[in-house]
Amino acid sequence: MGTARFLRAVLLLSVLLMVTFPALLSAEHHDGRVGICRLPSDSGDCLRFFEMWYFDGTTCTKFVYGGYGGNNNRFPTEKACMKRCAKA
C-alpha cells in the first residue's frame, strides 16, 4: 500500500511539472525581459482613472488604467516599469 501511494504522488508531481514547466519557460524571452513586458497596454474594463506605466518595447509609457482587468504590463511608477522591463 505504501508503494501505491508513492507512485501516485510521483505521478501527480510529474503531471504538475508537465503543466507548469512550459509556462515557466515561456515567461522569459531570449533577451531576459519578462513576457509581461511584451504585452500591449490594456486599460481594463472599469471607468476609474489611474495613471500607470507600461513597457512599449523600448521604454515605459504612461497610460490610464480603469482599475479592473487588463494585463500585467502595468506598473505604478516609471521606475518600477524600467526595473522590471528595461534591458540591463
UniProtKB/Swiss-Prot annotation:
The record marks 47-48 as: Reactive bond for chymotrypsin. Residues 37-85 form the BPTI/Kunitz inhibitor domain. Disulfide bonds join 37-85, 60-81. The record marks 39 as: May bind Kv1. Gene3D superfamilies: Pancreatic trypsin inhibitor Kunitz domain. InterPro entries: Kunitz_BPTI (IPR002223), Kunitz_BPTI_sf (IPR036880), TFPI/VKTCI-like (IPR050098). It comes from the Eukaryota. GO terms for molecular function: potassium channel regulator activity; serine-type endopeptidase inhibitor activity; toxin activity. The keyword Metal-binding does not apply. Expressed by the venom gland. Serine protease inhibitor that inhibits trypsin at a molar ratio of 1:1. Belongs to the venom Kunitz-type family. 03 (sub-Kunitz) subfamily. This is Kunitz-type U15-theraphotoxin-Hhn1f. It comes from Cyriopagopus hainanus (Chinese bird spider). The lineage of its organism: Eukaryota, Metazoa, Ecdysozoa, Arthropoda, Chelicerata.
